[in-house]
Amino acid sequence: HAGWLAAASALASEYGAGPDLIYLPETDFDMPKFINDVKGVYAKKGNCLVAVSEGIHYADGGFVSEAKVEKTDGFGHAQMGGLASILAEVIKEEMDVKVRGIELNLLQRCGAHLASETDIEESFMAGKAAVENAIAGINGRMIAFERGIQNGRYACKTKLVPLMEVANVEKKIPRSWINEDGTGVNHQFIEYALPLIQGEPDLPKQDSLPRFAKLKKILAK
């Protein structure tokens, strides 16, 4: 479990927006500390926005999302919620304030129309390299990106890495990119992630709707 998506919410903070607190699975989660963190922000601002990775865990390795919220429906059946619901219930009980827990879940995977031009170009580049290498008879390898600087700007190219080096291996956010308090990321993460969201593609439309892709099944020869 890695917190790249949740950490990316910090990019908006560069412009005075974004969450007040960010919690990632790269650090151990502490519920009493979380409550105090929220109380501290709320006392100063009168509101608090928190971004949480679904993989956060306690020091003993147990996932916070595995906790049960002791809440029942009209029939007495236990209502099980996601991580946001669990944390929202905790804050509601501790602070007696209005709380809303929003589970992005699949929604964050349905926003391809919001992908940056950089993301689209690199995805195409990786797919092209994969097909070319497969046709060339190369296997047991995975396409990887190699970042660099070209003419003073971010640049990226593909390379092959042995599959055994990356299979079932998580690429976690370096601890040095997370602030000491464990409630956000620092400039090192921003410098890493910001180039990846550059560029706004001109998306084709049809009747003001995105022109949905319809792929043909063509066998490679």
Where are the model-predicted features located?
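Accessory alpha-helical/coil subdomains and C-terminal extensions
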Residues: 1-100
